[in-house]
Amino acid sequence: MSPTALEVHDVAVKLATFVILRGISLRVPHGEIVGLVGRNGAGKTTTLRSIIGLVPILSGSIRLNGQELTNRPPHERVRLGIGYLPEDRRLIASLTVEENLLLPLWAADQDDGQNRLALIYDLMPEVKRLALRRAAALSGGQQKMVALARAVMAGRTLLLLDEPFEGLAPLLSRHLAEVIRALRDVAVLVTESDVNRMRLLTDQICTIERGEMVLEPGVGNSDASRIR
């Protein structure tokens, strides 16, 4: 197995008076894709948001290449090479596609935007064709593709993808899976509610239920279908 890029150990998250996550532990090696599968409300999104720093953790540790992330704000985590695709895409409608792609690098004060754009356009030529179009003019599928490209812009080391296939036609889902699998040397943690869609990407599947891990990657993956 490749060296570990992301290591989440015994993480708990409390929002208001509710403990949302309990004892979450997982690893994502460099160059590999790990899936996190669970019902709506199981804690998938909160897990990703805790890794990128959008929600604080109550206890435990989150490490990227051995560096503790717990006290680092989100923009510093982006500088370390973490890209995040939220489920709702969150493109800025008034900006062009290219401006949306550059946003995470601007926010993290990084100056290699043109090099990263060249990489994106090589990997996803359909995004290059949309570069000067306003985000408001894009279809839902195009928005999802651009949001993935924006995550890859920042995600030199780790990509966090929240329900990337949600709302997409099967053909576009397969294309998106091909793009994600084509990434080299990047660790990918992806969430899904449908284990069959997850298998478009990986057989390394964790299962989360009610904020707790119940299945680890590579262990009894066929049993994961029971959550559907």
Which stretches of residues belong to each language-model region?
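Helix-to-loop junction immediately C-terminal to a conserved catalytic motif
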Residues: 52
